């Protein structure tokens, strides 16, 4: 098992993950938004990054521009409507970090999404 501890805001390459519908996904970038609060985490939680910038039009997608800090190859979006469980064994490496302001924006959008969803359920 890897002894690398990733931090909130790290952008990591994940070899295998599970979509919310149960289907398996492979080889994608994620922003780490939390861990399991263990001294040596066995899983992390993250939001998926997509290079399909045309999807920026959706309210839960947030654009991040490539820069020397995040090391993205192109401008991308973070999909802020779902948090993925990422086992540490599936994280291959870190490529960069997002700015704290971007991270806070992701969390704000996610919380707004949950509030809207809650209102629809109780309506």
Region locations from a protein language model:
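A residue-level detector for short acidic-glycine micro-motifs
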Residues: 13, 32-34, 82
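Compact nucleic-acid interaction/catalytic patches
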Residues: 21-27, 32-67
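C-terminal terminal-subdomain/extension
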Residues: 67-123
């Amino acid at each position: 098992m890897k002894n690398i501890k990733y931090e909130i805001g790290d952008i990591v390459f994940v070899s295998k993950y599970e979509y919310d519908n149960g289907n398996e996904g492979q080889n994608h970038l994620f922003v780490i938004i939390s861990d399991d609060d263990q001294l040596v985490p066995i899983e992390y939680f993250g939001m998926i990054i997509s290079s399909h910038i045309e999807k920026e039009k959706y309210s839960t997608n947030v654009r991040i521009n490539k820069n020397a800090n995040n090391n993205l190859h192109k401008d991308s979006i973070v999909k802020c409507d779902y948090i993925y469980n990422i086992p540490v064994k599936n994280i291959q490496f870190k490529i960069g970090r997002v700015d704290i302001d971007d991270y806070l924006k992701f969390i704000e959008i996610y919380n707004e999404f949950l509030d809207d969803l809650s209102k629809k359920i109780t309506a």
